[in-house]
Amino acid sequence: MFTTVRPEQKPINPFIPYDLFTAIDELKRELNAVILAHYYQDPDIQDIADYIGDSLGLSQQAAATSADVIVFAGVHFMAETAKILNPDKLVLLPDLNAGCSLADSCPPQEFAQFKAKYPDHLVVSYINCSAEIKAMSDIICTSSNAVKIVNQIPEDQPIIFAPDRNLGRYVMEQTGRDLVLWQGSCIVHETFSEKKIIQLLMEYPKAEFIAHPECEPSVLRHASYIGSTTALLTYSQKSGSDTFIVATEPGIIHQMQKEAPNKRFIPAPAMNNCLCNECPHMRLNTLEKLYLAMKNKSPEITLPEHIRVAALLPIERMLEMSK
């Protein structure tokens, strides 16, 4: 006698309301909370956020907010930045495991030893780094303002640039400066296949290939436009082209499609037939986790005060130099 085994069904979480959008809106009013979301978040999180942006825009919003609670739909270093700027506010990250491969590629102890080899160098650190690395830096930058920041530093001042080597190379090309680079990288932006991108450009000869500067030089050399996520979004709206191959995390395509619904956006392919160009850390955040974080006021981002204070100054320098 045979019996049919039914597939195991996951029980419905009784603590999750059916209408999450309404429940989150109610909690937002109750807590006087603001939801900040990065472009790489899932579309449903982007749609409920009060502000969607790149690292620079999110930092500016975090610095300016009057909310009592900041819910950061992004990764750990972004929520840390919000806490550095707002020590008296409650900063929530829906999933504390939402880390960053680029930030992880620059361990504080190793970077301290690296920095000690260049005592006369100014340290410019990409915002995609831990609070400890920010605390060891002189100025923070983002992909939106890295070139602008470096151009404001006297030419006779030697510079360490950390942690992203690809962004560092791009800044060197744009500024003509010789930077000492920390050899870190982002797993997402290093997975794009030059060969497959060339094939796509042959398949879509009228398409524009646009790319984030965290991509490798072999990929960037084919791009008709290179810029931060916000810059890519703006360019795709203003360009006369109607088809784009986009080399960055594909979460940005949700906003591109909303802003230009009649245009076509094709995610740049990865080396393997996988979703490797989706950031696994960004995708840990879900609408359900966002709701529970607000309801439970946890997980909360906390920092040792001496680290926070030391990290604040280079961020404030960036915000001032970005005006």
Curated annotation (Swiss-Prot):
Annotated positions binding iminosuccinate: 38, 55, 126-128, 143, 212-214, 229
Keyword Iron: yes
Gene3D superfamilies: NadA-like (3.40.50.10800)
Pfam families cross-referenced by the UniProt entry: NadA
Cofactor binding, per record: Binds 1 [4Fe-4S] cluster per subunit.
E.C. code: 2.5.1.72
Keywords in alphabetical order: 4Fe-4S, Cytoplasm, Iron, Iron-sulfur, Metal-binding, Pyridine nucleotide biosynthesis, Transferase
Reactions the enzyme catalyzes: iminosuccinate + dihydroxyacetone phosphate = quinolinate + phosphate + 2 H2O + H(+)
InterPro entries: NadA (IPR003473), NadA_sf (IPR036094), Quinolinate_synth_type2 (IPR023066)
Pathway(s) served: Cofactor biosynthesis; NAD(+) biosynthesis; quinolinate from iminoaspartate: step 1/1
GO molecular-function term, one example from the UniProt record: quinolinate synthetase A activity
Any one GO BP annotation for this protein: 'de novo' NAD biosynthetic process from L-aspartate
Cofactor: [4Fe-4S] cluster
GO cellular component terms listed in the entry, alphabetical order: cytosol
Chain positions recorded as [4Fe-4S] cluster binding sites: 100, 186, 279
Annotated coiled-coil segments of the chain: none
Annotated disulfide bonds: none
UniProt superkingdom: Bacteria
Location within or outside the cell: Cytoplasm
Function: Catalyzes the condensation of iminoaspartate with dihydroxyacetone phosphate to form quinolinate.
Family to which the UniProt record says this protein belongs: Belongs to the quinolinate synthase family. Type 2 subfamily.
Name the UniProt record assigns to this protein: Quinolinate synthase
Organism of provenance: Gloeothece citriformis (strain PCC 7424)
Gene encoding the protein: nadA
